[in-house]
UniProtKB/Swiss-Prot annotation:
Keywords: Plasmid. InterPro entries: Histidine_kinase_N. Pfam families: HisK_N (PF09385). This is Uncharacterized protein pXO2-61/BXB0075/GBAA_pXO2_0075. Gene3D superfamilies: Histidine kinase N-terminal domain. It comes from the Bacteria.
Amino acid sequence: MEEIKCLLCRYLKERQEKFISDWKKKVIIRERDPYKEEIIKNGEHLLSAFIMYLKEEISLQEIEITSKKIARERIDAKVNIAEFIHNTNVAKIEIMNILTLLNPDLQQYQALVKKINQFFDHLIYYTVHSYYEQKA
């Protein structure tokens, strides 16, 4: 799995601008959202964090600070947290599509899908949890 994981990290790093550009075309960002620029910055930061997570340079707990920040921005913007979930899933789907392009064998694919799901599930869970905790 290490080889395919390195390939995925290198692919995402080398094509980060294109990845973000493609992601921006599919995300939901309201015109009235005071954090619309910050949404893009958060996406860039989370892509870097995802790469670091795959390289085992950070743990899942280290993205919880970002989760709290995003939750606060969504509350302040008075938007539904579902938009964040949608935007996060757009990124996850893009990464899964890239993974299939790299043509891993079944065992590598399953192991990487597990890592991808762990990262994005943790991110969504802690952001939504923090959103409702802060909103209360």
